[in-house]
Amino acid sequence: MNFLEIKGLRVFYPESSYSLNVDSLEVKEGETILIAGKSGSGKSTLLNSINGVIPHEIEVEEEGEVKVFGINVRNSTIQQIARFVGTLLQDPDSQIFNYYVIEELAFGAENLNIPREEILYRINKVSQIVGISHLLNKETFRLSGGEKQRVVLGSILIMNPKALILDEPTSSIDLKGTKEILTTLRGLKEKMSMIIAEHKINKVLEFVDRIIILDKGKIIYDIKRDHVKEVDFEDLGLEPLRPSPLPKKRRDGEVILEAKVKVTDGNRTIVDTEIVLRKGISALIGDNGSGKSTLLKALAGILPINLKFYGSIKVEGKEISKLPVEKRGEIIAYLPQEIDLMFTKKTVKEEVSYPAKVRKKYDERVIKELLKRFNLPEDRDPFLLSVGQKRRVAISSLLATGVKVFLLDEPTTGQDWYNRKMLGEELRSIDATFLVVTHDPLFVYYYADRVYKMVNGRVIPISPEDVIKDW
């Protein structure tokens, strides 16, 4: 039996010229498929058409036929489809609803009225498969990104699906977490069908059977793994399978920011380090929970109320650590991971323009150039954009202010290689100072002038070339 059969699928979004157009697609039971393509190419739309989110949850115009294990998706409910097909999303926090790991694992199975004894048996079995047996009694909010993804994956597997759909499962987790989740998926290959949408092509190539590449809503390649050398991925705006020789010289700019930062919660020290930022791009890498985001918030002056800052922050020799947040914001711009919290306007152009208008730095030409450079639809609602597009809106809104020091927390999350390159080129062209927190070794290798690694709350300088060794 085929896991998936698609015939004449057309998906049209209201108020958008974008569409998905798949004439025919079959996936055999037991196959593992990689779906690749630039942001906006139709990957998520295709996955949502398979798991029933389209047409049952997202309002679109659609036609054609989608069957999973012989069941017509349009004529079934999402709950019926979920018994056969489990879905793992980019952001694990969006799929976690319970306080303890064991409660989270049991949650879906309980909703299916599975007997308690059977649920406990499945929890024991699945927790070993995904490597979370030691986490069963841990609070979910204390987990790392990789641990959260494995917990969500475990909660899906407990419901015994016949297939998995994974929408960029490694995009929001660190390098350690990425290795953990990919190792788990590799072990599941022989047990079920899988469709994986992923930008990190070289990381999943070794265990997929086929590669399907989308462009502008259409399938342009459907090849077996053995024929992967026939495709120039970078020419398609996708990650290359191997990094090319470094194209640009690393710069050694003047010192702009000098800081001594100590952050505590009253019981333990979270960050205790010194850092010097020179003009140009400095990258900050490190495992989830090492203190990277806390350091950025300390520099920006927006630590949570339960955390205490000690130290000094000097920009161009002037102490700013005592300045109120609004004054410090005229010197340092901060991009959080939770970018939805930044949005207040109804259109992309209004959102990009707003911070510049508040600071009386508005320039129509600058706004138009940013919208063009970052390929942003100026009249769209920013809340309805993809994860990658939302980040480009938020970054553009900061760049429009003319601030000279930028703290960017995970700006490449959810972005394809084309847009990550565009971001890197844009940052390099600006006469400013950037500290970029990222789990993206390719971006660091190509665009960072300096690299720091956060280890247990301390910043350690490392070589950009070291970042790419295990890529």
From Swiss-Prot:
Keyword Plastid appears in the UniProt entry: no
Main location: membrane
GO-annotated cellular components: ATP-binding cassette (ABC) transporter complex
Pfam families: ABC_tran
Enzyme Commission number(s) from the entry: 7.-.-.-
Domain ABC transporter: 4-241, 255-470
Residues the record lists as binding ATP 1: 37-44
GO molecular function: ATP binding; ATP hydrolysis activity; ATPase-coupled transmembrane transporter activity
SMART domains: AAA (SM00382)
PANTHER family to which the protein is assigned, alphabetical: ABC TRANSPORTER ATP-BINDING COMPONENT (PTHR43553:SF23), HEAVY METAL TRANSPORTER (PTHR43553)
Protein name: Putative ABC transporter ATP-binding protein STK_11360
Species annotation: Sulfurisphaera tokodaii (strain DSM 16993 / JCM 10545 / NBRC 100140 / 7) (Sulfolobus tokodaii)
